[in-house]
UniProtKB/Swiss-Prot annotation:
Official protein name in the record: Mast cell tryptase
Keywords annotated in UniProt: Disulfide bond, Glycoprotein, Hydrolase, Protease, Serine protease, Signal
Phylogenetic placement of the source organism: Eukaryota, Metazoa, Chordata, Craniata, Vertebrata
Residues of the active site: H69 (charge relay system), D116 (charge relay system), S219 (charge relay system)
Residues of the signal peptide: 1-25
Organism: Meriones unguiculatus (Mongolian jird)
GO MF term set: serine-type endopeptidase activity
EC number: 3.4.21.59
Length: 270
């Protein structure tokens, strides 16, 4: 069986683990400028302190988009989760927001089977400013063709088994979109499975190359691409094998595939 690697830091015992292993954060990138990525959020779990475990994106003043494997497959207690809006450095003057509801996609049970997407409803809407505001969702017709240069952001590890060091700055890396069929072929290299078995599914999007990728702790965070002058969220950090390895692009949940589901809960206008 393909050894798949989760991108989330260990969190709830309810997280689906087998047959999955951990993966690792932003590789090959740099610290993000303080005025960029105003939709980036950090999800926190209450341990000895409110610890970062996944990323997410603000898509509405009261809604956060993230990966289902961060909080599922069963619905986690929202009282055990907090959201920190865009911060340059983790744990520096935190202002954590309460969550009223966590909604995982009903067909999710493991990352490699797709539907790795979830919504968090905040108890109160946030105040929108130049520093904090939602990212735009793409139109259903947007395909993000192969070679499109996009950006992924997060506070995850900076290499395999290498944690992001203090002061834990938000990192960014530019990654090219890889066409699904090519990505699937890449993932079949060195894997003993039939060519008729699709590892990369239609609801997934691939991006990254050797030396440039997302990693552990980045799960749930946004992959964004600038289209006609507007930043659109193309994907949600989901899974991969290793970190920035040859023939192993990062795999993201394709946002356009789940627009109808998202808008069952999240208003289109605000």
């Amino acid at each position: 069986m393909l050894k798949l690697l989760l991108l989330a830091l260990p969190l709830f015992s309810l997280m689906h683990r087998s047959p999955l292993c951990q993966e690792w954060g932003i590789v090959g990138g740099q610290e993000a400028p303080g005025n960029k990525w105003p939709w980036q959020v950090s999800l926190r779990a209450n341990e000895t302190y409110w610890r970062h475990f996944c990323g997410g994106s603000l898509i509405h003043p009261q809604w956060v988009l993230t990966a289902a494997h961060c909080v599922g497959p069963t619905i986690a207690d929202p009282n055990k989760v907090r959201v920190q809006l865009r911060k340059q450095y983790l744990y520096y003057h935190d202002h954590l927001l309460a969550v009223s509801r966590i909604i995982t996609h009903p067909t999710f049970y493991a990352t490699q089977n797709g539907a790795d997407i979830a919504l968090l409803e905040l108890k109160n809407p946030v105040n929108i400013s130049s520093h904090v505001h939602p990212v735009s969702l793409p139109p259903a017709s947007e395909t993000f063709p192969s070679g499109t240069l996009c950006w992924v952001t997060g506070w995850g590890n900076i290499d395999n088994d290498v944690s992001l060091p203090p002061p834990f700055p938000l990192k960014e890396v530019q990654v090219p979109v890889v066409e699904n069929q090519l990505c699937d072929l890449k993932y079949h290299k060195g894997v003993y499975t039939g060519d008729n078995i699709h590892i990369v599914r239609d609801d997934m999007l691939c991006a990254g190359n050797e030396g440039h990728d997302s990693c552990q702790g980045d799960s749930g965070g946004p992959l964004v691409c600038k289209v006609n002058g507007t930043w659109l969220q193309a994907g949600v950090v989901s899974w991969g094998e290793g970190c920035a390895l040859p023939n192993r692009p990062g795999i993201y949940t394709r946002v356009t595939y789940y627009l109808d589901w998202i808008h069952r809960y999240v208003p289109k206008d605000f």
